[in-house]
């Protein structure tokens, strides 16, 4: 019996050792996991209670200081310190790149206003802006505009009041034009890449007055209308981007659109721009209650043929021709 018990104990010894060999690593893994995940859980709880960080340190202030240091480091790579709110100084090679990229994008994607905005500033050379400044300084209204530096916004213009003005006033015509075209004076992009603060304001003023040029000439914001107004601005103010737009933009239009522009609207725009008073000197905000016909006469602006009407008549004529063609085709086709 004793020998049998010894044999059984000897036989079960490897099995126990084997089990112990499995249990010990498992216990070690469990202990290690408890330490790791338990520590993470405690850290999470401490973070939630606000006990993790040093309470004597203002981490929000430190983050703000780090951001400020990064901004200063970036500013040190600029050719000059920003000279007005929103100013982004560019090196000469960056201005050339801005001109090349925005010019390319504007030609192939004229519907994207951001491209036009960048091209406008890239081509707004100091000599042009200084000439525009002298034009404003030579006129009493222009001098007041430079001194007061007004902004054209919906808040300043009081759109609700414009809607109630007599229908023959500039303010009502302007309000109706904005409503019909579904645009707002608040959507004009700020100037960023022009270095001189006064030049930057002059270009911003030109940009903000653009919709008044549309409204007083009853020109829609479709591509033909935009090219026409750009040609008007180029002839009247000498805006480089407007001159480029008047020359190059028609090349991408359909034949019938180019024909309308070359035969009617571009000649009108150049003739009117050269003969009318400098539009940059018009204090539009003070003209809102004035009779629009009298104002056109004062500025020497004549209305062009209504572009919307011409397009509708062209579409109706084409529809009529297509209907006649299809009718004749059905009549001559054997059943």
UniProtKB/Swiss-Prot annotation:
Could you tell me which Pfam families the record lists for this protein? Coq4
The Enzyme Commission number assigned here is: 4.1.1.130
Q: What keywords tag this UniProt record?
A: Lyase, Membrane, Metal-binding, Mitochondrion, Mitochondrion inner membrane, Transit peptide, Ubiquinone biosynthesis, Zinc
Q: What this chain does, per the record?
A: Lyase that catalyzes the C1-decarboxylation of 4-hydroxy-3-methoxy-5-(all-trans-hexaprenyl)benzoic acid into 2-methoxy-6-(all-trans-hexaprenyl)phenol during ubiquinone biosynthesis.
Q: Does the keyword Mitochondrion apply?
A: yes
Task: Specify where it is mainly localized.
Answer: mitochondrion
For this protein, the record's PANTHER family field holds: UBIQUINONE BIOSYNTHESIS PROTEIN (PTHR12922), UBIQUINONE BIOSYNTHESIS PROTEIN COQ4 HOMOLOG, MITOCHONDRIAL (PTHR12922:SF7)
> The organism's lineage?
Eukaryota, Fungi, Dikarya, Ascomycota, Saccharomycotina
How does this protein assemble? Component of a multi-subunit COQ enzyme complex, composed of at least COQ3, COQ4, COQ5, COQ6, COQ7 and COQ9. Interacts with COQ3.
What cofactor is this protein dependent on?
A: Zn(2+)
Question: Residue range of the transit peptide?
Answer: 1-10
Homology family: Belongs to the COQ4 family.
Task: Please give the biological process terms from Gene Ontology that the record holds.
Answer: ubiquinone biosynthetic process
Membrane topology type, per the record?
Peripheral membrane protein
What reaction(s) does this enzyme catalyze? 4-hydroxy-3-methoxy-5-(all-trans-hexaprenyl)benzoate + H(+) = 2-methoxy-6-(all-trans-hexaprenyl)phenol + CO2
- Name-wise, this protein is Ubiquinone biosynthesis protein COQ4, mitochondrial
Q: In which pathway does it act?
A: Cofactor biosynthesis; ubiquinone biosynthesis
> Which residues does Zn(2+) bind?
210-211, 214, 226
Q: Where is it localised?
A: Mitochondrion inner membrane
Q: Name one GO cellular component term.
A: extrinsic component of mitochondrial inner membrane
């Amino acid at each position: 019996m004793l020998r049998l018990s010894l044999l059984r104990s000897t036989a079960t010894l490897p099995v126990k050792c084997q089990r112990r060999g499995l249990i010990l690593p498992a216990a070690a893994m469990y202990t290690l996991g408890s330490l790791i995940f338990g520590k993470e859980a405690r850290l999470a709880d401490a973070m939630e209670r606000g006990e993790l960080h040093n309470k004597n340190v203002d981490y929000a202030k430190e983050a703000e200081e780090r951001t400020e240091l990064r901004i200063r480091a970036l500013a040190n790579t600029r050719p000059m310190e920003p000279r007005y709110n929103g100013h982004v100084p560019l090196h000469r090679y960056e201005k050339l790149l801005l001109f090349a990229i925005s010019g390319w994008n504007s030609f192939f994607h004229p519907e994207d206003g951001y491209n036009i905005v960048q091209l406008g500033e890239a081509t707004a050379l100091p000599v042009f802006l200084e000439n525009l400044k002298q034009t404003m300084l030579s006129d009493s209204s222009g001098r007041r505009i430079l001194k007061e530096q007004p902004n054209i916004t919906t808040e300043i213009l009081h759109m609700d009041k414009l809607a109630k003005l007599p229908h023959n006033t500039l303010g009502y015509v302007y309000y109706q034009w904005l409503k019909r075209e579904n645009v707002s004076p608040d959507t004009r992009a700020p100037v960023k890449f022009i270095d001189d603060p006064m030049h930057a304001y002059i270009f911003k003023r030109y940009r903000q007055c653009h919709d008044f040029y549309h409204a007083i000439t009853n020109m829609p914001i479709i591509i033909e209308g935009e090219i026409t107004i750009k040609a008007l601005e180029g002839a009247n103010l000498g805006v480089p981007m407007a001159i480029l737009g008047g020359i190059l933009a028609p090349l991408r239009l359909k034949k019938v659109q180019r024909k309308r522009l070359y035969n009617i609207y571009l000649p009108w725009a150049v003739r009117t721009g050269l003969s009318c008073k400098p539009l940059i000197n018009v204090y539009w905000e003070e003209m809102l209650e004035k009779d629009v016909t009298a104002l056109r006469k004062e500025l020497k602006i004549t209305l062009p043929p209504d572009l919307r009407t011409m397009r509708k008549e062209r579409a109706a004529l084409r529809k009529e021709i297509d209907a006649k063609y299809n009718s004749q085709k059905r009549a001559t086709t054997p059943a």
